């Protein structure tokens, strides 16, 4: 619970501008881990040089961060939020669990830069994301998805 609270203390700047921060997160994810871009069919043809500032990427980044905000505010009681997300990401989008680990590290960096997430907050965010990803993976296994 303390980890969730520590992350939520720095969540304000993210909440204030989901679109910009979301765009930064996805752009950095795609630049640092180019294979992840292929998992998003609508972004697959966008050149690396054109990622930053792309409206569709920023809009999807905002969607990602809004969902994460819901998960953070649930403070671990997130089964009803996570289950439908796990279902769509396993059965429709086929997103391997490792990609959530990759985006978590990107999120730590972006929140450090844009939301003032200090070392303790970074550890808290990694812990929170570890909980969310473990629960997501458990849902994946129930669905028979081993990605």
UniProtKB/Swiss-Prot annotation:
Q: Which residues bind O2?
A: 60
Query: Which GO BP terms, alphabetically?
Result: removal of superoxide radicals
InterPro entries, sorted: Globin (IPR000971), Globin-like_sf (IPR009050), Myoglobin (IPR002335)
Which is an annotated GO molecular function term of this record?
peroxidase activity
Q: Does the keyword Mitochondrion apply?
A: no
Out of the domains of life, which is the source?
Answer: Eukaryota
Q: Which residues bind heme b?
A: 89
According to the UniProt record, one GO cellular component term is: sarcoplasm
Which residues are listed for nitrite binding in this entry?
60
As recorded in UniProt, its EC number(s) are 1.7.-.-, 1.11.1.-
Reaction(s) the record says it catalyses:
Fe(III)-heme b-[protein] + nitric oxide + H2O = Fe(II)-heme b-[protein] + nitrite + 2 H(+); H2O2 + AH2 = A + 2 H2O
> What PROSITE patterns is this protein classified in?
GLOBIN
Residue intervals of the Globin domain: 2-141
Q: Which UniProt keywords apply?
A: Cytoplasm, Heme, Iron, Metal-binding, Muscle protein, Oxidoreductase, Oxygen transport, Transport
Q: Pfam families, per this entry?
A: Globin (PF00042)
Where in the cell is the protein located?
Cytoplasm, Sarcoplasm
Query: Which family, according to UniProt?
Result: Belongs to the globin family.
Q: How does it assemble?
A: Monomeric.
**In UniProt terms, what function does this protein have?**
Monomeric heme protein which primary function is to store oxygen and facilitate its diffusion within muscle tissues. Reversibly binds oxygen through a pentacoordinated heme iron and enables its timely and efficient release as needed during periods of heightened demand. Depending on the oxidative conditions of tissues and cells, and in addition to its ability to bind oxygen, it also has a nitrite reductase activity whereby it regulates the production of bioactive nitric oxide.
Q: Note the PANTHER family from the entry.
A: MYOGLOBIN (PTHR47132:SF1)
The entry's protein name is Myoglobin
Q: Which organism is it from?
A: Thunnus alalunga
Gene name per UniProt: mb
